[in-house]
Amino acid sequence: MDQPTWKRPHRAKFAGVSDAAQQRQMPNLASIDLNLLVDLEALLQYRHITQAAQHVGRSQPAMSRALSRLRGMLKDDLLVAGSRGLVLTPLAECLTQMLPSVLDAIRQMMNLSLAPAQRRWKVTMAMPDHQAVVLLPHLLPRLHERAPHLDIVTDPLLGGALGLLEQGEIDVVVGQMGAAPLGYLRRRLYADSFTCVLRHNHPALAQEWTIEAFAALRHVAIASEPDELFGQIYDRLTKLGLQRGDPMVVSTVLTAAVLIAATDSVLVVPSRVATRVAAMLSLAVIPPPVELRPYEVALIWHERCHRDPEHRWLRGEIAAAASTAG
């Protein structure tokens, strides 16, 4: 007597049985319509032909035909009449557990081939807070228009960023890096210089803006700014015999700007950052009385993603946004 379909043992491959014989015993995958799996998912969920048909946008007769095809393909009734409607056979109960993961895998596989505008995906960008203030207002509108299902996550901490790029924990880094290490690639986004920000009615603005006046002020710094910036300032002041205390360090550019608006402190930031925060809080922007080297902001990524179409598209969008972030 034949065993029920759901109790048949797994057919292992034994010595002496040819590959051709094994293939004759297996279902022909080429003959399987993947749309039937979507119908099966709805039938198993609703256990009602009409409701399942409505869920997938089919007519009731079309869903009935799909159920008939599924029964023939799986050699099982799947749904049988019970006292309170249709009930699942043991095989159908098993498929209820298996099918969601199978369909999820198929959907994810198909999603990989979609254009950016159709894909649902996430990108993690590491960049200092003050660079995010410059870049994101130009980048996010582009991405929302061209890839509406793309989620952007930013991380202001650059420590260990190269290792995270290699591991795939983050996708790109935006920051100051003169040359990309071996295994990484670099694309210049824009150049910038440093400038000073003070409150609009700061007493120093009514006097000659000298290096002595600059050195006498309390300085505010952003934690994510490069240490070399303060090294430049400190070295120049030291050479001139001027003393300057350590700056008050805060975590974000917004906090720094609010402090500048409320105190007699001074903030040294990239010119693009200064322009944006000054417009928000009515601050004054003036050149520093000490010469500070300009710098470049670059996009860094790992070679593992270099040829990936979606990653290449993202890099192009970041570069295009940066070109308008003047």
Swiss-Prot record:
It holds the Pfam family LysR_substrate. It comes from the Bacteria. Residues 49-68 bind DNA. Keywords: Activator, DNA-binding, Nodulation, Plasmid, Transcription, Transcription regulation. CDD domains: PBP2_SyrM. Coiled coil: none annotated. InterPro entries: LysR-type_TF, LysR_subst-bd, SyrM_PBP2, Tscrpt_reg_HTH_LysR, WH-like_DNA-bd_sf, WH_DNA-bd_sf. GO terms for molecular function: DNA binding; DNA-binding transcription factor activity. Has two translation start codons in proximity to each other leading to a protein of 326 or 301 AA. Acts in trans to stimulate nod gene expression via nodD3 and exo gene expression via SyrA. Belongs to the LysR transcriptional regulatory family. This is HTH-type transcriptional regulator SyrM. It comes from Rhizobium meliloti (strain 1021). The lineage of its organism: Bacteria, Pseudomonadati, Pseudomonadota, Alphaproteobacteria, Hyphomicrobiales.
